[in-house]
Amino acid sequence: MIVEVFFRNYYRNYAKLEVDEVEKREFAFQPFVGGMVRHKAFKNLEELKRHLVEKTPRHVYYSTARYERPWEEDMERKGWLGADLVFDIDGDHLDTEACRESKVVSLACLEDAKEEANKLIDVLTEELGLKPTKVVFSGNRGFHVHVVDEEVLALGQKERRELVNYLKAVGFDPSKFHMKVGRRKVVLYEEEAVGNLLRIRRGIEDPEALKVEVDEVVTQDVHRLIRAPGSLNGKTGLVALPLSVRDLEKEVAHIVERAIAFRKGNLRLRFEKPFQGTVLFEKVEAREGDIKTLPAHVAIYLELQEFGKIYD
């Protein structure tokens, strides 16, 4: 499979994986053929990279949790040591015109996701006193925001669910909002604090505007697997790109451009279904059965999206 060869070359020559405390993480891999492979562990990033070159999976995931024995298949035997606090903002979950209209990587939809990520970061820092330590472009239609701090590692599912409810303004009542914030912070930090309440100043007349659209399942799950920063997204061929918080002040086109892994050469793609649109800055129009010569990153994207097949 030609795409697999490109993935292998990326992991051999270009990949810059960013996973801290590798030896305490469970890794999981989705191969190009076959089912998910889980409960893998590695001593360091170099050992992980050698595995990626040898096996070349389509997707690479790692646990937000740290374990004493990450290789154990029985979750009870892994020895849970705490979990990063991770928030997933996905264009698939945003009810905006741009995200509803497009299922490919759309710059307009990504702008909406970026704005939601900035909103989340404001709430975390200004209202809850949490400092995001890592932001990752997912390589598809969203962003992952990581908080890695001693005070959040030990939070259980209940506390994380309370935090999600706060972010999504579940049960919002303006007359009781100060009390609600206080209760949430008592649950999370065992101290009384009200926070800056930026969202009240911005949107008190519209409770819907107070919500931050995060995927609650990702944040609540203390054993969650999430895409490894620096790995390739097997749906697009783009890099799951580590970013700084300041990168979210830039246009998303700049972020997507940086995430393109395959910048050299062209590939021929035989279309198995019609397509018309813009793919990674390239306008493409084809009927079923057409053969087009396209930039490598565009052809790989379209094959991974099952619009056609690359051939020699």
UniProtKB/Swiss-Prot annotation:
Keywords per UniProt: DNA replication, DNA-directed RNA polymerase, Magnesium, Manganese, Metal-binding, Nucleotidyltransferase, Primosome, Transcription, Transferase
A GO MF term: DNA-directed RNA polymerase activity
E.C. number: 2.7.7.-
Swiss-Prot/TrEMBL cofactor(s): Mg(2+); Mn(2+)
Signal sequence segment: none
A Pfam family hit: DNA_primase_S
Keyword Transcription carried by entry: yes
Location of the active site: D88, D90, D215
A Gene Ontology BP annotation from the UniProt entry: DNA replication, synthesis of primer
Keyword hit for Repeat: no
InterPro entries for this protein: DNA_primase_S, DNA_primase_ssu_euk/arc, DNA_primase_ssu_PriS
GO cellular component: DNA-directed RNA polymerase complex; primosome complex
Domain of life of the organism encoding this protein: Archaea
PANTHER family (UniProt xref): DNA PRIMASE SMALL SUBUNIT (PTHR10536)
The family this protein is said to belong to: Belongs to the eukaryotic-type primase small subunit family.
Subunit structure: Heterodimer of a small subunit (PriS) and a large subunit (PriL).
Role this protein plays: Catalytic subunit of DNA primase, an RNA polymerase that catalyzes the synthesis of short RNA molecules used as primers for DNA polymerase during DNA replication. The small subunit contains the primase catalytic core and has DNA synthesis activity on its own. Binding to the large subunit stabilizes and modulates the activity, increasing the rate of DNA synthesis while decreasing the length of the DNA fragments, and conferring RNA synthesis capability. The DNA polymerase activity may enable DNA primase to also catalyze primer extension after primer synthesis. May also play a role in DNA repair.
Protein name per its UniProtKB record: DNA primase small subunit PriS
Source organism of this protein record: Pyrobaculum calidifontis (strain DSM 21063 / JCM 11548 / VA1)
